[in-house]
């Protein structure tokens, strides 16, 4: 008799995706972040569901409902901090996952890569709307500033902003719709993750060498299930340490003050995981130019497959590209730091140089490095 996992229609799908899936024998720990992102999504949806049971999306009660969750609900403080810091964990894993994709040339699986970019946009939208919900000072002013950027769109900008706000300012209608979207988007993300995996399993995983691994495959279970489990244990240990000992480290103290439209905080800034894009936005003095640069800072990921000039897929044996890659990582860290600083010298010029360097490395230097390496390696 056939084993049930190979014959049952539902189990068969799970079997092909997580048990009998042929995987390259040499994929490193950098390939763990896919499963860790799945874990992050489960943590966020679960904790978010329990928060939604006690949260009220009304401007008069939103702030106090979050306080009520922390003070009166059983382990409400824990659920709230898991959810708030879970977003940071999500983006750490997300950025490492993207970085691995760039380093090892995984972007040449174009369909998987493009779905990944859509997933990144959806996750960023979800995180932004979630940050507005506690209705603290930074929530309110962050929502006002970021939604206002759409007014830079010629002709339809102002109408578009008022349509999103549901009025002439960020108010009750805005909060209610943001809550609705923040609730539904994670489920759309989960559906898109399925599509992401579908495309990935069409081609199979890439590997650190960037060469075809058809001749050397091993089953996903038990090898990579146990490896993923180790990653999960390490991640959860670090995460819970952070949640229980430093829950407010990444948050903004301003968000412990209720939203007040008559009092602007001295420095309006988004959460840390958006600071690099915020720095790029601020480095251009023109409003529309800044918005375009902001969108392009993420959309530029889509050109990686088009600008791959090297004859080798992975950067493993390409020292010039490696140097540029780590320069890009350092540049993103500088942009993240600048995004959290006030708009004054010397931060303005540092941000502008870092923004130019970001696009320069991706669009010009990496493709040139690929061509040079082809010559050097006589590939």
From Swiss-Prot:
Matches recorded under PROSITE patterns? CYTB_CTER (PS51003), CYTB_NTER (PS51002)
User: Where do the annotations place heme b b566 binding?
Assistant: 97, 196
Q: Where are the transmembrane segments?
A: 33-53, 77-98, 113-133, 178-198, 226-246, 288-308, 320-340, 347-367
Gene3D superfamilies assigned to the protein according to its UniProt record, in alphabetical order: Cytochrome Bc1 Complex, Chain C
Q: How is the cofactor bound?
A: Binds 2 heme b groups non-covalently.
Required co-factors: heme b
Give the source's domain of life in one word.
Eukaryota
Question: So what family is this one in?
Answer: Belongs to the cytochrome b family.
Identify this protein by name.
Cytochrome b
């Amino acid at each position: 008799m056939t084993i049930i996992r190979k014959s049952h229609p539902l189990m068969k799908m799970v079997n092909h995706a997580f048990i009998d899936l042929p995987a390259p024998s040499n994929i490193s720990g950098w390939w763990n972040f896919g499963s860790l992102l799945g874990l992050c999504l489960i943590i966020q949806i679960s904790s978010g569901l329990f928060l939604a049971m006690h949260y009220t999306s009304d401007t008069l009660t939103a702030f106090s409902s979050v306080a009520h969750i922390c003070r009166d609900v059983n382990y409400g403080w824990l659920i709230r901090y898991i959810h708030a810091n879970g977003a940071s964990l999500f983006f750490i894993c997300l950025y490492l996952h993207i970085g691995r994709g760039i380093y090892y040339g995984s972007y040449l699986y174009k369909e998987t890569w493009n779905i990944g970019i859509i997933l990144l946009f959806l996750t960023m939208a979800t995180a932004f709307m979630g940050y507005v919900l506690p209705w603290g000072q930074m929530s309110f002013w962050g929502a006002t500033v970021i939604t206002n950027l759409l007014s830079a769109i010629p002709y339809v900008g102002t109408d578009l902003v008022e349509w999103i706000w549901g009025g002439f300012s960020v108010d009750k209608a805005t909060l209610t719709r943001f809550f609705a979207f923040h609730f539904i988007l994670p489920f759309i993300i989960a559906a898109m993750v399925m599509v992401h995996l579908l495309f990935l399993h069409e081609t199979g995983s890439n590997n650190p060498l960037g060469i075809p691994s058809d001749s050397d495959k091993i089953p996903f279970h038990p090898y990579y299930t146990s490896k993923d489990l180790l990653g999960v244990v390490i991640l959860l240990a670090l995460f819970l340490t952070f949640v229980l000992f430093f829950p407010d480290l990444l948050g903004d103290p301003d968000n412990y003050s209720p939203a007040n439209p008559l009092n602007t905080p001295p420095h309006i800034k988004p959460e840390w995981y958006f600071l690099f894009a915020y720095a790029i936005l601020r480095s251009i003095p023109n409003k529309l130019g800044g918005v375009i640069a902001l969108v392009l800072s993420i959309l530029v990921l889509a050109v990686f497959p088009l600008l791959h000039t090297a004859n080798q897929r992975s950067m493993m044996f390409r020292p010039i590209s490696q140097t540029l890659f780590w320069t890009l990582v350092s540049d993103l860290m500088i942009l993240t730091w600048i995004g959290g600083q006030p708009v004054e010298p010397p931060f303005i010029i540092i941000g502008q140089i870092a923004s130019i360097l970001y696009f320069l490395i991706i669009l010009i230097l990496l493709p040139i490095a690929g061509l040079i390496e082809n010559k050097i390696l006589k590939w």
